[in-house]
Amino acid sequence: MASKDFHIVAETGIHARPATLLVQTASKFASDITLDYKGKAVNLKSIMGVMSLGVGQGADVTISAEGADADDALAAIEETMTKEGLA
């Protein structure tokens, strides 16, 4: 299992557009990928799950991946987070 912590700097947090991009990125991988926020973990491949967390600016989240391509998945998600100005 691999995991990485992120501090959300985007003014709007993880709203619909970046959430969609994160879900699309995560869905490219076979690994199980979760987003943890305030003690609640959701499947990062589920737009409803990600949106239900209401992650705002200044939040600290952890993304974890478990599976054969976990490291590649985390690297791609980190790239998306950076490219979209989320973290």
UniProtKB/Swiss-Prot annotation:
It is found in: Cytoplasm. Keywords: Cytoplasm, Phosphoprotein, Phosphotransferase system, Sugar transport, Transcription, Transcription regulation, Transport. InterPro entries: HPr, HPr-like, HPr-like_sf, PTS_HPr_His_P_site, PTS_HPr_Ser_P_site. GO terms for biological process: phosphoenolpyruvate-dependent sugar phosphotransferase system. The active site is at 15 (pros-phosphohistidine intermediate). The keyword Cytoplasm applies. Phosphorylation on Ser-46 inhibits the phosphoryl transfer from enzyme I to HPr. GO terms for cellular component: cytoplasm. It comes from the Bacteria. Induction: Transcription of ptsH appears to be regulated in response to sugars supplied, i.e. is four-fold lower when cells were grown on lactose than when grown on glucose. Gene3D superfamilies: HPr-like. Its main location: cytoplasm. Residues 1-87 form the HPr domain. The modification Phosphoserine is found at residue 46. NCBIfam families: PRK13780.1 (NF010352), PTS_HPr_family (TIGR01003). Belongs to the HPr family. General (non sugar-specific) component of the phosphoenolpyruvate-dependent sugar phosphotransferase system (sugar PTS). This major carbohydrate active-transport system catalyzes the phosphorylation of incoming sugar substrates concomitantly with their translocation across the cell membrane. The phosphoryl group from phosphoenolpyruvate (PEP) is transferred to the phosphoryl carrier protein HPr by enzyme I. Phospho-HPr then transfers it to the PTS EIIA domain. P-Ser-HPr interacts with the catabolite control protein A (CcpA), forming a complex that binds to DNA at the catabolite response elements cre, operator sites preceding a large number of catabolite-regulated genes. Thus, P-Ser-HPr is a corepressor in carbon catabolite repression (CCR), a mechanism that allows bacteria to coordinate and optimize the utilization of available carbon sources. P-Ser-HPr also plays a role in inducer exclusion, in which it probably interacts with several non-PTS permeases and inhibits their transport activity. This is Phosphocarrier protein HPr. It comes from Streptococcus equinus (Streptococcus bovis).
